[in-house]
Amino acid sequence: MDSLILERLLAPTHLGAQISRQMKLDGALLLSARPEDIDASGYLSDLVGVTLIWSEPIGAPTRAVMKISHAGFGQPELPFYESIASHLNCNVIPEFYAGGVDETTGRTWLLMEDLSSTHERPSDEPLPPTFSRNASIVEALAKFHAAGWNRNDWHDVGPTLWDRLRSSDWLEEACHCLFAQAGDALDDRDRDAYARFLRGFPVLIERADRMQGRTLIHGDAHVWNWMLPRNGIAHSPKLIDWDGWHLGVGVWDLAYMMATQWDRDVRQRFEIPLLERYHAALIDAGVTAYSREALQNDYRLAVLLHMRTPIARFARNMSAFVWWPQLTRIQHAVEDLQCLDLLD
């Protein structure tokens, strides 16, 4: 962590002014903001604990975590917290205290609630969490999706799933490059499946445009982006790292979580029961006119469209440790759920 950027961002006058934009301080002044090491590592960001001392006990945070994104990353997360999260009234989203852009480096920074004493990771990546922990995650995800379900005020709120799908002119060439690199590690069945997918992709985009339940989605809601309450602590699960948020459909997050991240055996055992729990949680949260059958149909379409995901990882020059397992997992899910039948 660059000590100079911390010195700038944690200057009491500067940080206190930023916090005052998000909450009433009733004249209290921030006297000091002291950085501390925390047992957490950021992906494409630096994380540091912060102890805050105020002139008066007004209920302002005394412990927080500062996230400073690496240059060129994390920009969408700030407008999400500043303009979107406050309108959702959803406790799945961590509390946001302040944020901005460091003028010297252009790096985006956020000051958020410290979850270290109340929450923990659901498991050590890549070990899948237990079923009960996964159930807590999908129920909390449903709560978040329900908070933004079919709201009329999301028009022009930001990027959309359909915009991203339509901006896929790179897809076919990237497939050919990946297949050439993989060689005979990819069998003919996989290649044929992708050939069918590419031919039908324009039609799939139009079908996706008719999917039910438009809402805000996280975009990277794998289980290790969740923090679950520690045993004996009554808190909601928390979903972190919001730089991939956009308008879409809830099943997109679900399919990404299960079909691209879990090996076949785990997904086959957990998938249907977790979809049941997700649907029940949607209904409990007030969502209407969305049947379990409709959820299943939308989920299958989302899984099929996620054949694009490992190709996108490859096209962005991400490690084969990321895209190769995802390629295998999504092919298994497409086969198990007979998703290619949607192209007939």
PLM regions and their residue ranges:
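Conserved NTP-binding catalytic cores of kinases and kinase-like/nucleotidyltransferase enzymes
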Residues: 1-107, 229-237
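Regulatory N- and C-terminal appendages and interdomain linkers associated
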Residues: 1-41, 55-61, 204, 211, ...
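Active-site acidic catalytic loop and adjacent metal/ATP-binding pocket
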Residues: 39-57, 201-250
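Active-site activation/catalytic loop segments of kinase-like enzymes and analogous catalytic loops
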Residues: 79, 244-286, 303-325
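Surface-exposed helix-capping loop/turn segments at secondary-structure junctions
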Residues: 90-91, 148-157, 282-291
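Short pocket-lining segment of the protein kinase catalytic domain that shapes the ATP-binding cleft
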Residues: 110-117
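ATP-dependent phospho-/nucleotidyl transfer catalytic cores
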Residues: 119-218, 227-232, 326-329, 333-343
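Glycine- and acidic
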Residues: 122-127, 240, 258-264
